[in-house]
A protein has these predicted regions:
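Short strand-turn segments of transmembrane beta-barrel domains in outer membranes
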Residues: 171-207, 217-229, 671
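Extracytoplasmic beta-strand/coil segments of soluble accessory domains associated
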Residues: 82-127
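Acidic/polar loop-and-plug regions of large Gram-negative outer-membrane beta-barrel proteins
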Residues: 244-246, 251-323, 350-376, 429-450, ...
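Structural signature of Gram-negative outer-membrane beta-barrels, strongest in the C-terminal barrel
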Residues: 381, 399-413, 448-588, 607, ...
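Gram-negative outer-membrane beta-barrel transporters
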Residues: 472, 576-589, 594, 600-683, ...
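N-terminal Sec signal peptide and the immediately downstream disordered periplasmic leader
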Residues: 1-87, 324, 605, 616, ...
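Short acidic/polar hinge/loop motifs at secondary-structure boundaries
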Residues: 127-156
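Repeated loop/turn-to-beta-strand initiation elements of outer-membrane beta-barrel proteins
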Residues: 182, 211-214, 249-254, 336-338, ...
């Protein structure tokens, strides 16, 4: 069944909907999100709230932070959250997997098994999921960007380790509109090259009077997705809404979210690796290949309740999420402030994607390959989170001021999934491939992957921060104590009886704690130049990655993943030119389990580098960009042969350039994203070649309300590999060229 959050007529007749909306009377013009100072191309004057104890401008904060406005993001029609983040310096974001299950990290911290272990995804200051690397259940799966988005704040390193849990690498905060500006927009987007798709976006917000304001918006789409799949692989939508009541010097806010969506997932495809070089196989283009189609049979799997379930591989990544949030913030007088944020979310779904178990070898020119269908039920990834913060500001006779902050973060995250992976013989064809069932999940890969687990992770994290500001100097220190309690079970199957095996059921019952710290300072030499430095220590606790290995019943110590960082840099505005430069060094220790290789690892890493973010404006021409140089090494490992090697998929150099030029009512722009050569494995035997991707857009403004746009992702159809299996039989690449046309009406 096609998921739907809007009336069926809206899903089937988006053009009629857009046309009717265009006839609405003009209520207000949508105000473009431009900085007040047109030359402040990096928006260094924007006040940021993410991962900081006190609200202050980017120029005054002692952290590396980037911001993106909604209009910057929407112009290039990004296909997923990971693609948005590729434009942020210091972020390594692999956007090749579709609208979820992305791999992401910062500043040379490792991507050892997938997801975003060291980076927390947030919506409006609270985590979407408490852990960033849950197998088949990453935070970006439950995140969609649409017209509800106000702006994006991204912190690398810094105080992220003490002002949020499981985020020593950084924070990515998607901040919603709250009705402060009256108006809205309706948009229609059509996919015309690449995958066929139709999408309708709508939002509106404003004042209801008496200090009450609201915002509501969402999207509905149907189509193939970002590759030609031959069926409606992408179908669904989202609604978000909030209402705010201003009360004296504070406010109360209620927010709601409903997401019901399915999208295709893109996993590695069969390739051949010769002398460390990846080569595609005839008939299988890694940029476009998709082996699931209308002829793919239903997949019969074993459920958590012990019953067989018939599933449809064409559902791909199917997610459902509902959330309700409450937020309040008040100034109590005499320097006292209190803020509390609460959210309860239910998250569930199913992940289905085809992974090559081989590449058809040893027979040269093989017409078929063996595929494992990763079919994982996301039974429950719901959570309840609350962040309470109280602060007091003290002045002194010397004109300085100190702010003391105390907070308490609490969370309960459920992690309940069921795996059952059948195998198929699949035609070696990038489209229209036939698939024949061969092996039931009871026997796939030796029966390793019939799994069921249900674990509750409870986190209690008190934290405190002290900020002292005297003239041009700001100093801050913060500390956080994360305590995690895990309880539940995990079990495997009895392949003979074909049921869950009580003998394999293991209890989960352990506790962990870690105290993190962060010390920083910022000195503003003048209004256009500031220097900053910081040292921090943080932790990322693991969840399901610890199961099916060392006992987690409390009988032996449980490992955690730690990061120590130092950084220092400068922020400069010089006329039309702006630069944000940071030197960094990070040490990481981690333990890990990887589903595709069935291996446990224990490694230590070090990464040193330089991060640059620049901006320039000359009349109607604007350029923003960045570059990151990283020297990363494995410094210790349970596999001694990898010590001294470069961590897999870590390029020494990556860069981003985004020029735009306005010619009257026409605006032209591009995003050039490049990555240097990387190794595909920790042994450094397989090369992932360097590649550069060109995205482009054109936007024509007919009048103050109506605009027409065209955007292209991977305009030159570049082949760029983002990962390869350690034995070289399969690799994943970015999507090939896709082109979209959009019509937007502001009202």
């Amino acid at each position: 069944m096609t998921p739907s959050l809007f009336p069926r007529r809206a899903a089937l007749r988006p053009i009629a909907l857009a046309a009717s909306l265009a006839l609405l009377p003009a209520l207000a013009l949508a105000q473009a999100a431009e900085p007040k100072d047109a030359n402040d191309t990096l928006n260094l004057n924007r006040v940021v709230v993410t991962g900081t104890a006190t609200s202050a401008s980017k120029m005054k904060q002692s952290v590396s932070i980037s911001t993106l406005e909604a209009d910057q993001i929407l112009k290039l029609s990004p296909t997923n959250a990971a693609e948005i983040l590729r434009s942020i310096p210091g972020i390594r974001s692999e956007s090749s997997g579709g609208e979820g299950n992305a791999n992401l990290t910062v500043r040379g911290l490792p991507i050892s098994a997938g997801g975003a272990r060291y980076v927390q995804f947030q919506e409006d200051g609270l985590p979407i999921l408490l852990f960033g690397d849950i197998a088949f259940g990453t935070a970006d799966q439950f995140l969609r960007t649409d017209y509800n988005l106000s702006h994006l704040e991204v912190i690398r390193g810094g105080s992220a380790s003490t002002l949020a849990s499981n985020s020593p690498g950084g924070l990515v905060n998607f901040i919603s509109k709250t009705g402060e500006e009256k108006g809205g927009a309706a948009g229609l987007t059509l996919g015309v090259d690449g995958g066929r798709q139709t999408r309708v976006d709508l939002d509106y917000g404003g004042s209801l009077g008496n200090g009450t304001r609201f915002h509501i918006g969402g999207f509905q789409r149907v189509g193939e997705g970002d590759r030609k799949t031959g069926f409606n692989a992408a179908s669904g939508g989202q609604i978000k809404a909030n209402i705010t009541q201003d009360i004296g010097s504070g406010y109360l806010r209620l927010s709601l979210k409903a997401l019901d969506d399915k999208t295709p997932s893109f996993l590695p495809v069969p390739v051949i690796t010769t002398n460390g070089r990846i080569q595609s196989i005839a008939g299988v283009d890694p940029r476009t290949a998709f082996f699931i189609n209308n002829s793919t049979p239903q997949d019969l799997v074993f459920g958590a309740d012990g019953k067989m379930v018939s599933t449809n591989p064409r559902d791909g990544l199917r997610v459902k999420s509902t959330a309700i949030g409450l937020e309040g913030s008040f100034k109590l007088g005499d320097g006292w402030n209190i803020t509390d944020k609460f959210r309860h979310s239910t998250n569930s779904g199913r992940f289905i994607a085809l992974f090559p178990a081989d590449n058809g070898t040893p027979v040269a020119g093989a017409s078929k390959f063996t595929a494992t269908l990763f079919n994982t039920s996301i039974d429950d990834l719901g959570n309840t989170v609350n962040d309470l913060k109280i602060s007091k500001t003290f002045g002194n006779a010397a004109g300085g001021k100190a702010t003391v902050t105390a907070g308490l973060f609490t969370a309960k995250q459920q992690v309940a999934l069921t795996w059952f992976w059948n195998q198929y013989s699949v035609d070696m064809k990038g489209s229209g491939a036939g698939a024949t069932f061969t092996t039931a999940g009871w026997d796939t890969w030796g029966g390793c992957c019939v799994r069921n687990y249900n674990v509750a992770y409870e986190t209690t994290a008190p934290y405190a921060a002290l900020t002292w500001e005297a003239g041009a100097l700001t100093l801050d220190a913060s500390v956080r104590n994360d305590k995690q309690k895990a309880s539940g079970f995990y079990q495997e199957d009895n392949p003979i009886a074909k049921t869950w095996d009580p003998a394999t059921r293991k209890n989960v019952n352990y506790q962990l704690s870690h105290t993190s710290y962060s010390l920083g300072g910022n000195y503003q030499l003048n209004k256009d130049l500031a220097l900053f430095a910081r040292a921090s220590d943080g932790v990322a606790f693991s969840a399901d990655r610890l199961l099916y290995g060392t006992p987690v019943d409390g009988s032996v110590p449980v490992a955690s993943n730690g990061v120590k960082q130092i950084e220092g840099g400068a922020k400069l505005r010089a006329g039309a030119f702006s630069v944000f430069a940071t030197l960094f060094s990070a040490e990481t220790r981690e333990s890990n389990y990887e589903a595709t290789t069935q291996k446990f690892t224990s490694n230590k890493y070090r990464a040193d580098g330089l991060e640059l973010e620049v901006g320039y404006r000359a009349g109607d021409f604007k350029l923003t960009g960045g570059a990151t140089y990283t020297n990363a090494r494995i410094t210790a490992s349970n596999d001694a042969s990898t010590v001294g090697k470069t961590p897999r998929r870590q390029a020494d150099f990556v860069f981003q350039l985004a020029p735009t030029y306005a010619i009257g009512a026409l605006e032209l722009g591009a995003a050039v994203i490049g990555t240097g050569k990387a190794w595909g494995d920790d042994a450094n035997t397989i090369v992932q070649p360097a590649f550069t991707v060109l995205n482009a857009f054109a936007n024509y403004q007919f009048n103050d309300r109506l605009s027409l746009s065209a955007s292209a992702n991977n305009l030159t159809n570049t082949l760029g590999y983002t990962e390869v299996e350690g034995d070289g039989h399969a690799a994943r690449a970015i999507n090939g060229r896709s082109v979209k046309l959009g019509l937007k009406y502001n009202f």
